[in-house]
Amino acid sequence: ATFHQVGFQDYVDYDFAILNRRERRTMMTHPHSNKYSYTFDDPEYRGIFYDKWEFDRVFSEYLGRDWMMVTDDNVDELRAFGEAHPVLITKKQAGRSGAAINRYYSTEIEDWADFHAQLRERGELLIEENIVQHPDVAAVCAGTVNSTRVAAFFDGEKTHILAMAQKFGRGQAADQMDFGGFYTMLDPETGASLGDGYDSHGHVHKL
C-alpha cells in the first residue's frame, strides 16, 4: 500500500491483484486523489466542502431544497418543518461515505420535543428537505438520492471533466457503497452509461 499509494478499497475496486506494474500506475487511488486535492484546492475555501453545515449556508440559493438548523429552543420550527416535509434528512457537521446522514419520516415522530433533544444529543443539527428526483432516475433505485459525480480540474482558465459516474443507492439514506450502493461510469460527452454497475463487494448490477 505504501509503495503504490493504494488503499484497501482501491486494491479491491481496481482489481490490483491482476494488474501489471504499468497498469497500476494509471490508477487514481484515494491517496493520490487526496494529494492532488490538497495541492490544488484553494485552502481559503477547502473547508466549506468538508463542513456540511457551512456548505448549505454558502450555497443555499443553489440547493433547490429547504433546510434548517436545530438550535437550543426551536422545537416549534422543527415541527413546522416536519409538517411541511414528510421525509427529513439530517446531517452531522462532518463525515464521509454517508456516515453523517440519516433519514426520518415525519409521520413516525410522536414527540417533537424528544426528537429535537435526540438530534441535538447526536449532533444531527442540519435538517434538509428530501430531494425528489426525476422519475427515470428514481426508477432504478427508489428511496435514495442517486447522485451524479463529476471529477473536474480547473487549470486557471478552463475546467476539464476528468471522469463522470452515476451512483445508485439501495433504498438507504445515502447512495454510498457503505450503504450497499453501486456505480456505473458515464461518457463525459454523452452522459450515457459505459457499462454495468459495480459495488464494493464484487457484485455486478445490470443496467
Question: What do the predicted segments below correspond to?
Answer:
Residues 1-61:
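Low-complexity, highly charged intrinsically disordered N-terminal segments
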Residues 15-33, 79-100, 197-202:
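Short N-terminal signal/transit or membrane-insertion segments
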Residues 2-7, 102, 192, 206-207:
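Proteins with a high burden of low-complexity, intrinsically disordered sequence enriched in S/T/G/P/A and R
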Residues 35-156:
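Active-site nucleotide/adenylate-binding loops and adjacent lid/helix of ATP-dependent enzymes
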